[in-house]
A protein has these predicted regions:
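Formylglycine-dependent sulfatase
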Residues: 1, 5-217
């Protein structure tokens, strides 16, 4: 888990005047309060504390709870009518799991570890309750992170910027959007790679439109 005292590339670039952003899969921790976060309030360690001016991230990965995006230290699209509770120790009463309720899963079988809370028809690592409108839909993850990444590029086109863009596409659970399903002979993994290619293509298209391609690594 990264902590604010660790020096990383984004710190050096920020010192050099770069706008810094991170979008997508994170899984590098949210500070030293792991397991103690109140997901219904600003998180004690935001990515701003770790050197990023802007962040739109998964708390960890798509196969783990909570299945919500964190934007600048707070749950994106937070739904006050569905407060979020998370545990990696035990389930919440009445909440279905992949182990006990496999009939609720969407075309995927539970596996050891990935057999706990069911969100969007997929069993995850860990247990959660609530979320409501803040819960992501796995088939829309690529569209969501691409949209926020493009917004970051456009908002910082007039100055140097550094963006860490991490997709979840080939990481389990592979759940590409319908428009990519069946596009690759390698099955769902191949379809997820098609979706990844599209994501990179959208960012490249944006750089072209902004006239930044030749000045971007």
């Amino acid at each position: 888990s990264l902590v604010g005292s660790e020096m990383c590339i984004r710190d050096r670039l920020k010192e050099a005047g770069y706008a810094t952003g991170v979008v997508g899969k994170w899984h590098l921790g949210l500070g030293d309060k792991a397991g103690e976060q109140d997901w219904n309030a600003p998180l004690p360690t935001a990515l701003g504390d770790l050197g990023f001016d802007y962040s739109y991230i998964m708390a960890a990965t798509a196969d783990r709870v909570p299945c919500v995006f964190i934007e600048n230290g707070q749950v994106a699209n937070y739904d006050p009518d569905a407060p979020i509770y998370v545990s990696y120790q035990q389930n919440f009463p009445g909440e279905p799991t992949g182990k006990d309720n496999p009939e609720l899963l969407y075309n995927q079988k539970p596996s050891f570890g990935h057999d706990q809370s069911i969100v969007n028809g997929i069993s995850r690592i860990g247990y959660m309750k609530g979320g409501g409108k803040a819960l992501w839909k796995d088939e829309n993850i690529a569209d969501s992170i691409v949209t926020h990444a493009i917004d970051f590029i456009k908002e910082n086109k007039e100055k140097p910027f550094f963006m860490y863009f991490a997709t979840n596409d080939v990481h389990v659970p592979r759940f590409p959007h319908d428009r990519f399903r069946g596009k690759n002979p390698m099955g769902v993994r191949g379809d997820a790679i098609e979706q990844f290619d599209w994501s990179v293509g959208q960012l490249m298209k944006t750089l072209d439109e902004m006239g930044l391609t030749e000045n971007t690594l």
